[in-house]
Amino acid sequence: MSDVSKASLPKAIFLMGPTASGKTALAIELRKVLPVELISVDSALIYRGMDIGTAKPTASELKAAPHRLLDILDPAQAYSAADFRRDALAEMAEITAAGRIPLLVGGTMLYFKALLEGLSPLPSAEPEIRARIEQQAAEQGWDVLHRQLQDIDPVAAARIHPNDPQRLSRALEVFFISGKTLTELTQTSGDALPYQVHQFAIAPASRELLHQRIEQRFHQMLASGFEAEVRALFARGDLHTDLPSIRCVGYRQMWSYIEGEISYDEMVYRGVCATRQLAKRQVTWLRGWEGVRWLDSEKPDQARNEVLQVVGAIAN
């Protein structure tokens, strides 16, 4: 698409970054001075009743700056990147029609990628193939199937943990149905996003600072009642660790503690480590991201002003 064609498209802003980087605070500040409406891009914030462990914006923050695509699902439900793209496009169209600019804020990079580049259609599930995969897993174990996936699709295998049967089964199923790997299919883009997008990433200047913020925030969550929040989910009886909601960072570790699998101290250690690993993956995505402007979260006023310099002109 030519620069002239891009300039005629409606505007949108991406505010991306690793967990605990200050994205929400900056987005709320920007909403005070720009004609923007916020859309959450977070695979954990979609779930109702999961507030503390996801660092969901507080009631007062949401009153000042409402977020769309927040609290839209029960934790028993699944939600795909394709679901997100469909819902985000609808919200963006509504915001644009009202004469305002969509500001998409979050850290689920797969959602941002799906929205920006589109998705190639994946084959629908086939119960017979899924049953065959699950039978093999029951007989030989998921570790064997994970090694099988390593031979078929090493990129997907590196991303999918052997203890994640839902995603592991789906990756194998896609290959058995289509003859193409999940990686091949997801690298084939669909319809590109019909917006002129200004992309920003916010993070501390050093990894050590980010690690400190992550550890501090995890302890703040514990002090704010995170254990009670997960115990309430556990007590429902219909949730389990195969669900995407309970596999969220922090929740999986707290669930293991509640089930008696690990000690409290081990839960804290694993929770902090898992959050740091998530942040590392997010930063790795962003370092390879084209057209992104980096902001220093340790200098919030400067970060805000940098966004305003770029976006201010298009917002008037």
Swiss-Prot record:
State its Enzyme Commission number(s): 2.5.1.75
Q: Which reactions does this protein catalyse?
A: adenosine(37) in tRNA + dimethylallyl diphosphate = N(6)-dimethylallyladenosine(37) in tRNA + diphosphate
Q: Which Pfam families match?
A: IPPT
One BP annotation, GO: tRNA modification
Q: Where is this region: Interaction with substrate tRNA?
A: 42-45, 166-170, 247-252
Enzyme class comes to transferase
The reply to whether Transmembrane helix figures as a keyword in the UniProt entry is no
**Cofactor(s) named in the record:** Mg(2+)
Q: Which GO terms describe its molecular function?
A: ATP binding; tRNA dimethylallyltransferase activity
Q: How does it assemble?
A: Monomer.
Its annotated function is as follows: Catalyzes the transfer of a dimethylallyl group onto the adenine at position 37 in tRNAs that read codons beginning with uridine, leading to the formation of N6-(dimethylallyl)adenosine (i(6)A).
What family is it from?
Belongs to the IPP transferase family.
The protein's name: tRNA dimethylallyltransferase
